[in-house]
């Protein structure tokens, strides 16, 4: 085999090899509200935590995707809002060599799971600065959420 043919074959194999790497992590937006401060600090603290998750993704360059994990945490105490935190944790990911289904899964589950620890850290930091105890969100199974979302979409399209 000639050197040119070997080089072309190596380049073809390299182009088909799946690549997924995080290029950058960034905090896109963060908001903290504590509407009942400072009176809430005089109450017995029995928090009820509500959590909302959402993800967005878009292609921003050749094989480069922006993924944004949006988390809203609402903590109530005795039925009243103690605080509300909203975070948009972003990341740039280089992804190539995946078919459409694999790419959709990577953008909908793998990338958000990679961003979650950064978002959780930012949420804890702002909550503590608001003079509340750290919330330490439990790990989230983004693969299960992704599968659930797909099943829900399929059920809606069959109706």
Curated annotation (Swiss-Prot):
SUPFAM superfamilies linked to this entry: SecB-like
GO molecular function: unfolded protein binding
Biological source species: Marinomonas sp. (strain MWYL1)
Assembly, per entry: Homotetramer, a dimer of dimers. One homotetramer interacts with 1 SecA dimer.
GO BP terms: protein folding; protein tetramerization; protein transport
Protein name per UniProt: Protein-export protein SecB
Family membership: Belongs to the SecB family.
Functional note: One of the proteins required for the normal export of preproteins out of the cell cytoplasm. It is a molecular chaperone that binds to a subset of precursor proteins, maintaining them in a translocation-competent state. It also specifically binds to its receptor SecA.
Gene3D superfamilies according to UniProt: SecB-like
Entry keyword set: Chaperone, Cytoplasm, Protein transport, Translocation, Transport
Pfam families: SecB (PF02556)
Gene Ontology CC terms, in alphabetical order: cytoplasm
Alphabetized InterPro entries for the sequence: SecB (IPR003708), SecB-like_sf (IPR035958)
HAMAP family: SecB (MF_00821)
PANTHER family given in the database record: PROTEIN-EXPORT PROTEIN SECB (PTHR36918:SF1), PTHR36918
């Amino acid at each position: 085999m000639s050197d040119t043919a070997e080089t072309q074959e190596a380049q073809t194999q390299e182009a088909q090899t799946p690549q997924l790497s995080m290029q950058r992590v960034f905090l896109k937006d963060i908001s903290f509200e504590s509407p009942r401060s400072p009176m809430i600090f005089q109450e017995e603290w029995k928090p009820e935590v509500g959590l909302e998750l959402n993800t967005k993704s878009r292609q921003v360059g050749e094989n480069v995707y922006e993924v944004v994990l949006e988390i809203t945490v609402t903590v109530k105490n005795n039925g009243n809002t103690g605080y509300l935190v909203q975070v948009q944790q972003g990341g740039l990911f280089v992804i190539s060599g995946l078919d459409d289904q694999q790419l959709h899964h990577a953008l909908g589950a793998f990338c958000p799971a990679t961003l979650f620890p950064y978002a959780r850290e930012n949420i804890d930091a702002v909550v503590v600065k608001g003079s509340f105890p750290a919330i330490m969100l439990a790990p989230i199974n983004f693969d299960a959420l992704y599968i659930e979302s797909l099943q829900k979409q399929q059920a809606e399209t069959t109706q």
